[in-house]
Structure formats: C-alpha cells, structure tokens
C-alpha cells in the first residue's frame, strides 16, 4: 500500500526534474496556484463524498495525488513531513 504513495512521490520528483510536455502532473508542478486550487477543490469534494457516502475512495485518492504534487511544487520534502509525523507518535 505505502509503495503506491512512495511511487507517487518518486513520480513527482522525477517529473519536476524531467518534465513531459502535456503532462497534467507537470502542469501541477509548474503552476503553484493551480496546484493549491486543486488541493482545496479535491478536499472539498472528499468532504462532500463522505457526507453523501458516495465516491469516497475516488475522492480520497484525488486528495492524495494533488497534495503530493502541491508539496513537491512547493519544495516540501516528504521525508521532513514523515519525520514530523514520527515525532508526534506517543
């Protein structure tokens, strides 16, 4: 399961270094404003899906994908996020 998330982080880093023309991923990585808008949009869609008990998995996946791209676009390193989460374990 976590391998899928790790693959997305690797994809984001790779595409940031080696862009592919026409790639949606690259569009998100190069346009911080769009990336931010998409994270907000997808979170709202997830909340709605949970409230309606419909399409929750699809919307949750969208949130993960767009959040990963947003973090990478803004040079937030996942390793640092993971370190912070580890500090919070009790």
Q: Residue locations for each model-derived region?
A:
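Flexible "arm" and connector segments at domain edges
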Residues: 1-60, 64-90
